[in-house]
Amino acid sequence: MNQNIIYTVYGDLKLTLKNMRPDVLLHNPVMFLTEVSLFVSIFIYIFPSFFGVPYTGTYRSFYVAVVVLLFLTVFFSSISTALSEGKSKAITDSLKKFKTDVIAHVQKDGNIVDVRSNELKKNDIIIIYKDEIVPIDGEVIEGSGYVDESNVTGESRAVMKVIGDTVTGSTRLVTDKLKIRATADPGSTFIDKMIELVEKSTREKTPNEISLTVFLSGLTLIFLVITASIFAISHYFGRTANIVMLIVLLIALIPTTIGALLPAIGIAAINKVSEYNIIAKSGRAIENAGDIDTIILDKTGTITIGERKAVKFYPNKGISDVEFAKLAAMSSYYDQTKEGLSIFELAKKQGAEISKDDLKGYEFIPFSSETKFSGIQSPSDTVIKGSLKALKEKFQVADEFIEALCKEISMRGGTAIPVVHNGKFAGVIELQDLIKPGIKERISEIKNMDIKTVMCTGDDEVTAQYISAQAGIDEYIANSKPVDKYNVVIREKEGQRMVAMVGDGTNDAPALAKADVGLAMNNGTQAAKEAANMIDLDSNPTKLMDVIFLGKQILITRGSLTTFSIANDISKYFVIIPAIFYMFPSLSLVNILDLTDPIVAVTSALIFNTIIIVFLIPLALGGVHYKPTSISEMLKRNLMIYGIGGVITPFIAIKLIYMLLIAWGVTW
């Protein structure tokens, strides 16, 4: 353990020294100018006569203090960035540890051939047995079983995988046997892409960060011109301004605090999202999350728990309970979804015994988001289950009893699945899915931030209305198809609103790509994960709300520290200007702290300028405390804390530092 700590400290120190190189700091104009000032100060100390500055014992000690403090300013800035980069490196290192080279059982021409996982190819058919490592990313094409994904998602509970589900390489099958089709080549797996994304995301600046850097550069240039003007004006009045004093003035006035912490804030944003087991493809995605105006939520899995189960069968008039249970089982025999399996289990409990032999000659009709039904058919028999609207349109059939029953189930928040047998309604299956605990409070927090909520669901109008009212949703879209999500994204963006959404299917890909924040589920399709700009390793749709909170917090952190840094400059101005121009008695009016020793006063300001960076590093890395509220309330609160606080804090701190230096007999 001690050795690990040594390696961590050594690694952070190496990153810190690398970040102090001029070519690296060139991308941060504020800190680059600070480092140039450090080199100039060293040069002045070595060759004072060249610059015509006083070099008595007092001034010599002062120059040393300036050099040390400027070095520490650059060092503390670099170490804050190194700490953030160190966390990102730890994330990529942990992902690399998950990559496992194992033996894979490949099915070729009817035979099973063992090959190493790094020799596999896309579309290879692979057999995985109980307790074996999944050799590569793939899609389940046969069998079912529980897969331990804890090394990727952190979830300790194994996840059930059925036909059509995706599995991730380096996870472990803990039960049964699976046959999968490889969906990636070695080097292009999910984990490989995650490593690439994390490494890439730490290097890119976001648009807001670029804009802020330009603003800080302009501010720095203005203060550089002002400082140079002071040097010229002092010559005009027959005075020689001390260049080291002017350097201290420049460093104290330019926004060194936010300049020092800005890179760390950007990298910390990626790290904070990673702590939620979410991989962001870029800092832009996180930044967009902070500006979201509309959030599109799926009902199942986001508003509700997402595990709909069959709870009751309702036979139509003239059909017995056992007869309808048998029809429900037939319609779900080949349906390997969790809902289909629950229907089959309930039918078995009610005495319906169906085997594969009973269904010889039948063809499976798979469910699709377009048709909204599934079942089986033979030349002489058809059993189909699905949405009421879809079945009525397909079979041109109506039944008042069935329609009333579906409405009653929907009004209590359930999902009604009618079953049609040879063109006539045979009965209704009731599925129930509970609203997630605490979701109403979370939706309320979202609305407090002036964010509009839209729920999309494949359920009918009555169920959608009931669920949206229970959860406090602003707008709902019932009988939703994938194209509806895309249309909502387009509609909201045309209204100049920024949109966030969740998706997991290939049909969600267009909407995910169009949304400003698209969060794909890890258990979703490859197309969805490629279209989205964030991927949730835990496949928890509710995390979209966490992403928005994080985005807001990161933007507020950057804004708060910028406000604090600029407010600091106002205070330091009233400390340093009277100290530099102590020979002009008229300027004593602005010496509101009554600092009588100009050199100690300037040193005190520079000490504060340096140590405030250290105190703000935890805030930059951890983020400013954020409470969901309106923009006006948030602005008012931050101006009070970081604006007024940014003016008052330096006055108090500099005065205390000055008094301590005088008390210790420091007079240079």
UniProtKB/Swiss-Prot annotation:
Gene Ontology molecular function: ATP binding; ATP hydrolysis activity; magnesium ion binding; P-type potassium transmembrane transporter activity
Catalytic residues identified in the record: 298 (4-aspartylphosphate intermediate)
Membrane topology: Multi-pass membrane protein
Cellular localization per UniProt: Cell membrane
Sites where the protein binds ATP: 335, 339, 367-374, 385
InterPro entries: ATPase_P-typ_cyto_dom_N (IPR023299), ATPase_P-typ_P_site (IPR018303), ATPase_P-typ_TM_dom_sf (IPR023298), ATPase_P-typ_transduc_dom_A_sf (IPR008250), HAD-like_sf (IPR036412), HAD_sf (IPR023214), P-type_ATPase_bsu_IA (IPR006391), P_typ_ATPase (IPR001757)
Keyword Zinc among record annotations: no
GO CC terms in record: plasma membrane
Residue ranges crossing the lipid bilayer per the database entry: 31-51, 62-82, 213-233, 243-263, 573-593, 599-619, 644-664
Keywords carried by this UniProt record: ATP-binding, Cell membrane, Ion transport, Magnesium, Membrane, Metal-binding, Nucleotide-binding, Phosphoprotein, Potassium, Potassium transport, Translocase, Transmembrane, Transmembrane helix, Transport
Enzyme Commission numbers on file: 7.2.2.6
ATP-binding in keyword set: yes
Reactions accelerated catalytically: K(+)(out) + ATP + H2O = K(+)(in) + ADP + phosphate + H(+)
Similarity section: Belongs to the cation transport ATPase (P-type) (TC 3.A.3) family. Type IA subfamily.
Subunit-level organization: The system is composed of three essential subunits: KdpA, KdpB and KdpC.
Function, in words: Part of the high-affinity ATP-driven potassium transport (or Kdp) system, which catalyzes the hydrolysis of ATP coupled with the electrogenic transport of potassium into the cytoplasm. This subunit is responsible for energy coupling to the transport system and for the release of the potassium ions to the cytoplasm.
UniProt protein name: Potassium-transporting ATPase ATP-binding subunit
Organism: Thermoplasma volcanium (strain ATCC 51530 / DSM 4299 / JCM 9571 / NBRC 15438 / GSS1)
